[in-house]
């Protein structure tokens, strides 16, 4: 269907521009963007995510470094590694793959990353800049940044007169998404799983962002005809039709039921996910440019 937003294709276009801008940095200023990824333990899902990020970084022409720490590593050792990377001029972006083991304080780890190298956009200073509408100076969390690019592709950069509803209030997606949409002049409602009359609120949305972590929660009767639906959810559910014990990935939106009612909708997989990794590359490229006080490439 023509109304399905192809996240893979859009991400490929973003990556092509990142490659081009990386070549310019190398040729004009002899600088290669560098990213360091830290993974603690051997969680299979985390291993897959880290491998895809590292592969994409190398594809972009970045210097890429991966640090694998044992699950039982002391928090102090992790913080010491972050401090070393903070001081390394070859590294412009640092990310700690989440989740971390229970004995490590996630906030202490993410806040230890230098603000200018916080390419996940999780540092309180970057969050504060975004909330204060100082977007040009902030590093924007990757998933909201990617979702926003998809929305702009459909609606343009000025969302005046449009109602946007976000279902999900996380610091990683919901809250930064609300700030970005507000900055683009949308009228924003930030809802969550405990919001009263949630289906009715969703039906008012010209732009509906689902980021609540509940598989196929958003049904057809929740969606306004002609809405743009961005599904950030990624959930694994049983797929007995594939065989015993098999699973499949679905979003927070009941895609098959909802898609015919929308102006545009993102699938899961192949929607927001590829854009998240693409925006991580964008953030790293921008961090490298800022490190030399060069103009920041626009995307």
Swiss-Prot record:
Gene3D superfamilies: Leucine Dehydrogenase, chain A, domain 1, NAD(P)-binding Rossmann-like Domain. GO terms for molecular function: methenyltetrahydrofolate cyclohydrolase activity; methylenetetrahydrofolate dehydrogenase (NADP+) activity. Its EC number is 1.5.1.5, 3.5.4.9. PROSITE patterns: THF_DHG_CYH_1, THF_DHG_CYH_2. The keyword Transport does not apply. The keyword Lyase does not apply. Pathway: One-carbon metabolism; tetrahydrofolate interconversion. Pfam families: THF_DHG_CYH, THF_DHG_CYH_C. It catalyses: (6R)-5,10-methylene-5,6,7,8-tetrahydrofolate + NADP(+) = (6R)-5,10-methenyltetrahydrofolate + NADPH; (6R)-5,10-methenyltetrahydrofolate + H2O = (6R)-10-formyltetrahydrofolate + H(+). NADP(+) binds at residues 168-170, 193, 234. One of its GO terms (biological process) is methionine biosynthetic process. Keywords: Amino-acid biosynthesis, Histidine biosynthesis, Hydrolase, Methionine biosynthesis, Multifunctional enzyme, NADP, One-carbon metabolism, Oxidoreductase, Purine biosynthesis. GO terms for cellular component: cytosol. Homodimer. Catalyzes the oxidation of 5,10-methylenetetrahydrofolate to 5,10-methenyltetrahydrofolate and then the hydrolysis of 5,10-methenyltetrahydrofolate to 10-formyltetrahydrofolate. Belongs to the tetrahydrofolate dehydrogenase/cyclohydrolase family. This is Bifunctional protein FolD. The gene is folD.
